[in-house]
Amino acid sequence: MKRSSVSTCGAGRLSMQELRTLDLNKPGLYTPQTKERSTFGKLSTHKPTSERKVSIFGKRTSGHGSRNSQLGIFSSSEKIKDPRPLNDKAFIQQCIRQLYEFLTENGYVYSVSMKSLQAPSTKEFLKIFAFLYGFLCPSYELPGTKCEEEVPRIFKALGYPFTLSKSSMYTVGAPHTWPHIVAALVWLIDCIKIDTAMKESSPLFDDGQLWGEETEDGIKHNKLFLEYTKKCYEKFMTGADSFEEEDAELQAKLKDLYKVDASKLESLEAENKALNEQIARLEEEREREPNRLMSLKKLKASLQADVQNYKAYMSNLESHLAVLKQKSNSLDEEIGRVEQECETVKQENTRLQSIVDNQKYSVADIERINHEKNELQQTINKLTKDLEAEQQQMWNEELKYARGKEAIEAQLAEYHKLARKLKLIPKGAENSKGYDFEIKFNPEAGANCLVKYRTQVYAPLKELLNESEEEINKALNKKRHLEDTLEQLNTMKTESKNTVRMLKEEIQKLDDLHQQAVKEAEEKDKKSASELESLEKHKHLLESGVNDGLSEAMDELDAVQREYQLTVKTTTEERRKVENNLQRLLEMVATHVGSLEKHLEEENAKADREYEEFMSEDLLENIREMAEKYKRNAAQLKAPDK
């Protein structure tokens, strides 16, 4: 098997399972990553973009060793747009609500609310991040320093597709920073949920199981294929580029697994060839008509729209037909009723015609009958008027009777109310004394229905009135006696008040004298206390002055002693330095004097020699040579000037 897969290594791989190679040539197994992704909700065109370097053929590492890829290494720069609507306040509030619900449901120990999550501090954000990342790495603890570098690094290691800058960690709750960070936290929550679901789900293969469940795209997880891929990958990492042995082993295992019959291979190859030809033909048709699917989809959509229109038209026709049927039924009923009325009228006309044909009266009899009919009608009208007058009079009498009845009932109600207030009714009341003072009005008994209550109620009431008057007189006498007693008590009270007022005046005078004495005593005490306090202050001042003078003298003495010691030390050091310098100076002077004496002796000897040589030479000749030399030098100096 030749290498035909390209592996892209992402940072921070969490799974410890074997790496799976992707065959980009197989349709359905690879999903191309386009720039417009809908992973995080609605797309938004106004989003911040971030650039990052994406290595397509990067350096691969493995637990069994590493090797250099023969495909070469290159990188490309692509802009990844954040499709999440981070400028949408509703979306940000939804993210904050998801974060708040996850924290409260999973036992976040610190206090948190929707209001605090609108603009949290950096410290609160670090607590939330440490709590969330603890689900993926339980032993993780945030470092004490450089958290602004640690958090973006962890997100990058987890494969977060967007960049969190280091500066954003300093201003977490800022309006321009918090939407990006809360979206990253929601992404981390999604990772936690996926990790939890993967941990709770059953393993891909049980012992002895060769095939997994079929997924939505029709792929079956084959344990043999995974083992084959693992072996090829390990061999590939050691430097191999062909895998004939593994191919042969896999082919043998697959034949054993599917129980392949060699005799049927030719028929299968023919069938495979036919299918390949059919695939080629379909691909050619697709190339000839690249937009056939779109046209078919449009045709299907138009046909579906026509079907919907026809269905709506049929429903309208059915409703219209139902209305027409209802109208037809009502018209049929109306026609039947009119026919019955017409038949009835015809029968009545026939009956009346037969009566007219069979009657035996003449015209004079008919006129007489009509005259009698008119007289009877006048009599009926007169009696009707009399009846109406009598009915009106009866109505007036009934109204008068009703008003009288209402007045009597109102008086009886007032009487019963007053009797209940006086505790006369019912019969066993406190003041009834065994009499029944209740009056029952029954108009149907006639005009004398209330006469019996005159003897039943009047005499006991009279007796009660007399007793009440006697009690009232007794109470008045008692009241007058009590008023006299009250007047005497008021007189005594007035005298007592006068006595009390005099005593209060005496007490006030004594209180004033007592207050004056107390004030004088307090003034004396205050004066004594102030004198004592001044003496105490003077004493403290004297003591503090003596102590301060003593401490100052001691401090001065210590300072003088320290200064003396420092001066002695400095003087000793300077004396030693001066002696050393003086000794070196004397040595240098002696050396210099010796060298000068030697130099002077040499100069004297040289001068003697030059004097002797000078005396032996011709002085005039030397002067002439010097003059000529001077003239030549002067001529040379004048030549450049010209």
Swiss-Prot record:
It comes from the Eukaryota. Expressed in spleen, testis and thymus. Pfam families: DUF5595 (PF18077), Ndc80_HEC (PF03801), NDC80_loop (PF24487). This is Kinetochore protein NDC80 homolog. Residues 1-445 are annotated as: Interaction with the N-terminus of CDCA1. The keyword Cell division applies. The modification N6-acetyllysine is found at K53, K59, K527. Residues 251-618 are annotated as: Interaction with NEK2 and ZWINT. Residues 361-547 are annotated as: Interaction with PSMC2 and SMC1A. It is found in: Nucleus; Chromosome, Centromere, Kinetochore. It comes from Mus musculus (Mouse). One of its GO terms (molecular function) is identical protein binding. Residues 240-403, 458-639 form a coiled coil. Residues 128-251 are annotated as: Interaction with RB1. The lineage of its organism: Eukaryota, Metazoa, Chordata, Craniata, Vertebrata. Keywords: Acetylation, Cell cycle, Cell division, Centromere, Chromosome, Coiled coil, Kinetochore, Mitosis, Nucleus, Phosphoprotein. The modification Phosphoserine is found at S44, S55, S62, S69, S165, S242. Component of the NDC80 complex, which consists of NDC80/HEC1, CDCA1, SPBC24 and SPBC25. The NDC80 complex is formed by two subcomplexes composed of NDC80/HEC1-CDCA1 and SPBC24-SPBC25. Each subcomplex is formed by parallel interactions through the coiled-coil domains of individual subunits. Formation of a tetrameric complex is mediated by interactions between the C-terminal regions of both subunits of the NDC80/HEC1-CDCA1 subcomplex and the N-terminal regions of both subunits of the SPBC24-SPBC25 complex.
